[in-house]
Regions:
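Extended beta-strand/beta-hairpin segments
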Residues: 1-16, 24-132
């Protein structure tokens, strides 16, 4: 629409807010899970799809026919452990709890955005990457 790519796009900032909030929420959830979840950090690889029809609809002096919004955020959350090993079930449970508690994820869902983030251990991610 404009600019010279000298700064982040607004949608990139929304994704950055989601990642930051989910990192903080994951740390909180891991700390309070029993037995404690040995979380070191989570690496996110996310992509967003947006409906631009509302933003670019003409004529400009009429209300757009649809809302301009994110339709979908998808990708992976790759969990790195501080020690030991964890079951896939516990990693997936961590992801579910984070998604349930993250305020930014909740705001996106409330706007009608579909979130499809697959939580997996770093080792699983590397194994899956080699197979694909």
């Amino acid at each position: 629409m404009g600019g010279e790519d000298a700064a982040p796009q607004p949608v990139e900032l929304v994704l950055a807010a989601l990642v930051g909030c989910e990192q903080a929420t994951a740390a909180y959830v891991a700390r309070h899970t029993r037995p404690r979840f040995p979380l070191r950090y989570v690496h996110f690889d996310l992509r967003a799809t947006r409906d631009e029809r509302g933003a670019i609809a003409l004529p400009i002096d009429e209300r757009p026919p649809v809302s301009s919004r994110l339709l979908r955020v998808e990708g992976t959350a790759i969990v790195h452990l501080s020690r030991g090993a964890e079951s896939r079930a516990r990693v997936e449970a961590l992801g579910r709890r984070v998604e349930e508690r993250c305020p930014v994820a909740d705001m996106l869902r409330a706007s009608g955005c579909e979130l499809d983030v697959r939580w997996q251990m770093a080792k699983d991610f590397l194994d899956d990457d080699r197979e694909g």
